[in-house]
């Protein structure tokens, strides 16, 4: 290496230094790309699961509203009781299945109980809880109505007595749908047995939905457990703060036209 006139050694040029001390970034390994891809894929899966859960809760809300309309129709003289009870059983069974699926999906995407939670998940928890509470209430109403009409029928059969045709026609016109005119005592006994079976099935489904409601409350995230009823539906992003209650915060169990 040549020396400068003043005795100092000549430093390498800038280009030489850059070539000597050049530091290149190592290429991304396959694992880095996989981690980046898996992060976006995980977020996409979470959003898709959230959308599926939201749709399930909305469908369950509709089923509860339909079941409520059927319960109101019990005893209506314009409705055939056997067909009404069959439709109630179909709607109730479908609603119970939707409630179970919604609870499973919601529990899967909620994450740790004491961790950060998306406000949309909080709303789904509250909506599902409200629907389940209304669902069990309507089941109890149907049990009471069917039981009272069944008791009314048995009381009239026990009283007995011959009736003329005119009085029977007048009675049938004022009788609730559960008391359809029967041609024989055997059919009457079969009808009573079917109603009793429907009541037992409804009681079983009601117990199952109450247990599901208890599980939902147990697995509910801590931010929701710490909120009072007045602020449950006025949720803000985590951490939650209390807000003024809005006038219209949403409706539960309405059939959309």
UniProtKB/Swiss-Prot annotation:
Cellular component per GO, a single term: plasma membrane
The organism's place on the tree of life at top rank: Eukaryota
Region (Disordered): 1-45
Biased composition (Basic and acidic residues): 32-45
Keywords: Cell membrane, Cytoplasm, Lipoprotein, Membrane, Nucleus, Palmitate, Signal transduction inhibitor
Motif segment (Nuclear localization signal): 242-247
Tissue and organ expression note: Specifically expressed in the central nervous system including the retina but not in other non-neuronal tissues (at protein level).
Membrane topology listed for this record: Lipid-anchor
Keyword Transcription regulation: no
Lipid attachment residues per UniProt (S-palmitoyl cysteine): 252-253
Post-translational modification note: Palmitoylated. Undergoes rapid palmitoylation turnover. De novo and turnover palmitoylation are both mediated by ZDHHC2. Palmitoylation regulates the cell membrane and nuclear shuttling and the regulation of GPCR signaling. Upon depalmitoylation, it is targeted from the plasma membrane into the nucleus. GPCR signaling inhibits depalmitoylation and promotes localization to the plasma membrane.
Subcellular location field: Nucleus; Cytoplasm; Cell membrane
GO biological process annotation, one example: negative regulation of signal transduction
Biological role: Regulator of G protein-coupled receptor (GPCR) signaling. Regulatory subunit of the R7-Gbeta5 complexes that acts by controlling the subcellular location of the R7-Gbeta5 complexes. When palmitoylated, it targets the R7-Gbeta5 complexes to the plasma membrane, leading to inhibit G protein alpha subunits. When it is unpalmitoylated, the R7-Gbeta5 complexes undergo a nuclear/cytoplasmic shuttling. May also act by controlling the proteolytic stability of R7 proteins, probably by protecting them from degradation.
Record's subunit section: Interacts with 'R7' family proteins RGS6, RGS7, RGS9 and RGS11. Component of some R7-Gbeta5 complex composed of some R7 protein (RGS6, RGS7, RGS9 or RGS11), Gbeta5 (GNB5) and RGS7BP.
Family: Belongs to the RGS7BP/RGS9BP family.
Entry remark concerning the domains of this protein: The nuclear localization signal is both required for nuclear localization and palmitoylation.
Protein name according to UniProt: Regulator of G-protein signaling 7-binding protein
Organism whose genome encodes this protein: Mus musculus
């Amino acid at each position: 290496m040549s020396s400068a006139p003043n005795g100092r050694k000549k430093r390498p040029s800038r280009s030489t230094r850059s070539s000597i001390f050049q530091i290149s970034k190592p290429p991304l390994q396959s694992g880095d790309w996989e981690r980046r891809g898996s992060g976006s894929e995980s977020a996409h899966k979470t959003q898709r699961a959230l959308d599926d859960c939201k749709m399930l809760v909305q469908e369950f809300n509709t089923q509860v509203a339909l079941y409520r309309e059927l319960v109101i129709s019990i005893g209506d003289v314009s409705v055939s009781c056997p067909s009404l009870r069959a439709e109630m059983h179909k709607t109730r069974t479908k609603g119970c299945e939707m409630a179970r699926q919604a609870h499973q999906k919601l529990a899967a995407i909620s994450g740790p109980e004491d961790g950060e939670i998306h406000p949309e998940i909080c709303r789904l928890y509250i909506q599902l809880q409200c629907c389940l509470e209304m669902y069990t209430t309507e089941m109890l109403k149907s049990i009471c109505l069917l039981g009272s009409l069944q008791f009314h029928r048995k009381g009239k059969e026990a009283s007995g007595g011959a009736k003329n045709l005119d009085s029977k026609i007048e009675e049938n016109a004022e009788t609730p749908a559960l008391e359809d005119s029967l041609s024989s005592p055997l059919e009457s006994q079969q009808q009573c047995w079917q109603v009793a079976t429907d009541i037992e099935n409804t009681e079983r489904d009601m117990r199952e939905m109450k247990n599901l409601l208890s599980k939902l409350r147990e697995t509910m995230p801590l931010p929701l457990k710490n909120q009072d009823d007045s602020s449950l539906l006025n949720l803000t992003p985590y951490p939650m703060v209390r807000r003024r209650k809005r006038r219209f915060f949403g409706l539960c169990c309405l059939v959309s036209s």
